[in-house]
């Protein structure tokens, strides 16, 4: 969602139009509806803190390693979110991931 909204903005597309187009199809979800609107309005109030999201991803990464799995997408998401915590975004909601792309 964050990548799609970043792309839309870079191409001069309206984020609300994008969300409306994808939300009614297979890509739609409650998370998209809820977090997408918050991102577009700049509402980063936490429903779930970024710092807790990273903690949970670290637990998942540890369990994956214990199982002998290499979960590249998890590792990339964890790295991206950790960089936001390093920038002081740990107390924001996980929708603040958009800030990673707004560097």
Task: Give each language-model segment a name.
Residues 14-24, 75-79:
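Beta-strand segments within the central parallel beta-sheet cores of soluble alpha/beta enzyme folds
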């Amino acid at each position: 969602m964050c990548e799609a909204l970043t792309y839309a903005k870079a191409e001069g597309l309206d984020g609300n139009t994008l969300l409306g187009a994808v939300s009614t199809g297979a890509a739609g979800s409650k998370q998209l509806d809820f977090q997408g609107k918050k991102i577009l309005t700049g509402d980063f109030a936490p429903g779930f803190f970024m710092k807790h999201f990273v903690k949970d991803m670290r637990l998942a990464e540890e369990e994956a390693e214990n199982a002998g799995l290499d979960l590249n997408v998890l590792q990339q998401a964890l790295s991206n979110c950790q960089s936001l915590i390093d920038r002081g975004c740990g107390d924001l909601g996980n929708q603040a991931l958009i800030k990673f792309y707004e560097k």
